[in-house]
């Protein structure tokens, strides 16, 4: 007898064989049954036939599912470590340039499949292959890589952690309120202390989230379908073609970055300072900077995000900032530096902050309402079904009854394997308590402003917020980790107060909260992927833990490389301005200081944009999907407010390329667009490693390509002729 029972196809074959043995034609018997059947039974049989054709697990039924220990292979973690370094560089670069980070799940799954498939093929030819490459192992790699590179975001290297530094404090003009400059030792220790709690907080709820509530987790589901498709014969062929395309554009992007480097010998030199629309437009950051990374990001991000970014850039740098600049000497002092928080920079930062907070608050409330209404519906539904069974005097409904929900073969098999390897609740609760105790003891020594009782309060509420974030992400595919972090900034910062280091306490609390809720939603997303690929929950948990540990080591080292290689890291007009670091410090400053330090009419404009962000979201939801998808996103519109629209132009170029490609050849665009985009992002992202090494070694580019107006060029020529 085979394991796992009979597949629908096998059941049908046995039934037809038995009918033939009795001399009855299966087709005639099926026709008789169809005539005598009720409409509902005919519908059931039709659904059964469709299920037999569409069953995913039916395809893999003959393949043995490895035990959870065999899913965790050495080769999987070697490949994961290599890919985590690659993706950490990519995420770090995006984090320190614009803060816009697209989903890299597809790239991680595709590259993981390619590397291990190549490895196993070589071993197979040499006769040393002991274990074939399975979709479960592919899922382990995907989970580990995403967990590791996720630390590059939740670790705060472009937000709360870098916001503590002297470099960002100088721009905000509040050095006296406390600084803590980056150091490799304390950053690694901090991440190890705070990054694992979220994993333990949601482990006991995995069955409720995945099986009982059947939350969709769109990203996790899409990743699982991708991995399942890789391991079918047709999917493997397509994956090879996709990897080939990715490799071509990776090479192009890498060598394009290398070529551009030769022309960047000075400030504002090179192709990334090309005045595409003229020098006047360039002054207000309207130009195409030839960034392969953001062209690729534009191909991945939805059209509405790219359009929203461009609209935000036009509204701010094309209209608002030139108008406010004319009020110099009236609304703010005329003698302040352009980067001073007492001048125009304050309007750029705080209006963006107000818009982000308005958008975040609206979506926070919306997701919470959906979360609690969904929970109430689930609880009522279960209570109703139990009471109806308890009081029902009639015999149970037949399998054909519409009262009994049908469970597909795929769901039966997936549920059986998902519940097979349990993670004990005592282990999860005990782990949370132990790590909380260690963290509460260590963190006050790292941040003297962060008192032990602040940390205990955070850890009491964190599991509730982690559950809310994980449930909300399951419904909407939207993690609100940064919003919960901002909530911690304001609450802990205000509690500590300005005179007791509230600014640093708020930023540190943000890091604690953000890491907990972010890893919690990531793990439940991975549980969904594991459920759909028959990967063991234990394997998913161990992979997430190992990936998180990798991230706690790799991400600080990558950031440290950037920090040491680029002296202007974090400055407004540099290659890596780290815009959200300024935003987070400004939020912390607001939390402890209030709004009294803002320039004239800045507060009024903040109120207006806060309200407009909520109103736009309300209009978007009221219009529904048909028309609401054309309404811009306030969060995306706010990012260019202090950064400029140049990267939005890059992303719109990516959108335009994708749009034209879809019109010319939609099937190929659907199959290869993500591979092209991933190649562009990965190649340019990995170029930052050699460029950082060259900068640390003191190797300078040989040429400065700079653009001047005719009048300035004439003066320069005259000066050079005079000096000669």
Curated annotation (Swiss-Prot):
List the keywords (alphabetical): Membrane, Phosphoprotein, Transmembrane, Transmembrane helix, Transport
* Key word tRNA processing present: no
Superkingdom of the source?
Eukaryota
Q: What is its main location?
A: membrane
- Residue list for modification Phosphoserine: 25
Q: Please verify whether the record's keywords include Coiled coil.
A: no
> Which residue stretches does the UniProt record annotate as biased composition, category Acidic residues?
43-56
Q: Where are the transmembrane segments?
A: 72-92, 96-116, 144-164, 184-204, 245-265, 304-324, 349-369, 423-443, 455-475, 478-497, 501-520, 541-561, 603-623, 641-661, 679-699
**Main function:** May be involved in the transport of nicotianamine-chelated metals.
What protein am I looking at? Probable metal-nicotianamine transporter YSL8
The organism's lineage is: Eukaryota, Viridiplantae, Streptophyta, Embryophyta, Tracheophyta
């Amino acid at each position: 007898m085979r394991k796992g029972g009979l597949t629908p196809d096998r059941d049908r074959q046995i039934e037809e064989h038995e009918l033939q043995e009795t001399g009855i034609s299966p087709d005639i018997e099926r026709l008789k049954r169809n005539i005598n059947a009720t409409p509902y039974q005919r519908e059931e049989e039709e659904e059964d036939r469709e299920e037999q054709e569409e069953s995913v697990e039916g395809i893999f039924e003959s393949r043995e599912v490895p035990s959870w220990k065999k899913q965790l292979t050495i080769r999987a973690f070697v490949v994961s470590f290599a890919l985590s370094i690659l993706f950490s560089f990519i995420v770090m670069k995006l984090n320190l340039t614009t803060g816009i980070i697209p989903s890299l799940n597809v790239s991680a799954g595709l590259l993981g499949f390619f590397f291990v498939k190549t490895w196993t093929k070589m071993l197979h030819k040499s006769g040393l292959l002991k274990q074939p490459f399975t979709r479960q192992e592919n899922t382990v790699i995907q989970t580990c890589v995403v967990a590791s590179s996720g630390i590059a975001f939740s670790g705060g290297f472009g937000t709360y952690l870098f916001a503590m530094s002297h470099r960002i404090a100088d721009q905000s003009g509040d050095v006296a309120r406390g600084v803590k400059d980056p150091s490799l030792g304390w950053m690694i220790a901090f991440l190890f202390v705070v990054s694992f709690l979220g994993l333990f907080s949601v482990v006991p709820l995995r069955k409720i989230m995945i099986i009982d509530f059947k939350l969709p987790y769109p990203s996790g589901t899409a990743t699982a379908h991708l991995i399942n498709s890789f391991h079918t014969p047709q999917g493997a062929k397509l994956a090879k073609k996709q990897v080939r395309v990715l490799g071509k554009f990776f090479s192009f992007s890498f060598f394009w970055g290398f070529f551009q480097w030769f022309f960047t010998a000075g400030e504002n030199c090179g192709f990334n300072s090309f005045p595409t629309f003229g020098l006047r437009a360039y002054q207000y950051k309207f130009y195409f900077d030839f960034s392969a990374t953001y062209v690729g990001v534009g191909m991945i991000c939805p059209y509405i995000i790219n359009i929203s970014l461009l609209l935000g850039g036009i509204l701010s740098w094309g209209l608002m900032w030139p108008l406010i600049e004319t009020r110099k000497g009236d609304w703010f002092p005329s003698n302040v530096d352009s980067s001073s928080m007492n001048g125009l920079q304050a309007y750029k930062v705080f209006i963006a902050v107000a818009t982000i907070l308005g958008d975040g608050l609206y979506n926070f409330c919306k997701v919470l309402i959906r979360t609690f209404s969904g929970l109430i519906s689930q609880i009522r539904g279960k209570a109703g079904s139990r009471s109806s069974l308890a009081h029902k005097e009639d015999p149970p409904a037949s399998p054909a009854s519409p009262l009994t929900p049908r469970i597909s073969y795929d769901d039966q098999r997936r549920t059986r394997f998902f519940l097979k390897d349990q993670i004990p609740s005592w282990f999860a609760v005990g782990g949370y308590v132990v790590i909380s105790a260690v963290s509460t003891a260590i963190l006050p020594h790292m941040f003297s402003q962060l008192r032990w009782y602040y940390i205990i309060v955070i850890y009491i509420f964190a599991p509730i917020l982690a559950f809310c974030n994980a449930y909300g992400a399951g419904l909407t595919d939207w993690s609100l980790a940064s919003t919960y972090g901002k909530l911690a900034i304001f609450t802990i910062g205000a509690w500590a107060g300005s005179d007791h280091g509230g600014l640093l306490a708020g930023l540190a609390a943000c890091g604690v909260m953000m890491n907990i809720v972010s890893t919690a939603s990531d793990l439940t997303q991975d549980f969904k992927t594991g459920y759909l690929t028959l990967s063991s929950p234990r394997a998913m948990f161990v992979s997430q833990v190992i990936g998180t540990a990798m991230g706690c080591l790799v991400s600080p080292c990558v950031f440290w490389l950037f920090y040491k290689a680029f002296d202007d890291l974090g400055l407004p007009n540099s290659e890596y301005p780290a815009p959200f670091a300024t935003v987070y410090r400004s939020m912390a400053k607001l939390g402890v200081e209030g709004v009294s330090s803002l320039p004239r009419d800045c507060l009024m404009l903040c109120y207006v944009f806060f309200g407009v962000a909520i109103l736009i979201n309300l209009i978007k939801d009221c219009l529904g999907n048909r028309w609401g998808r054309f309404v811009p996103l306030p969060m995306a519109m706010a990012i260019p407010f202090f950064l400029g629209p140049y990267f939005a132009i890059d992303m719109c170029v990516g959108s335009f390329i994708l749009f034209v490609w879809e019109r010319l050849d939609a099937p190929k665009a659907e199959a290869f667009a993500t591979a092209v985009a991933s190649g562009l992002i990965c190649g340019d992202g990995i170029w930052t490693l050699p460029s950082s090494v060259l900068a640390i070694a003191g190797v300078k580019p040989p040429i400065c390509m700079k653009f001047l107006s005719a009048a300035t060029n004439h003066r320069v020529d005259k000066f050079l002729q005079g000096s000669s």
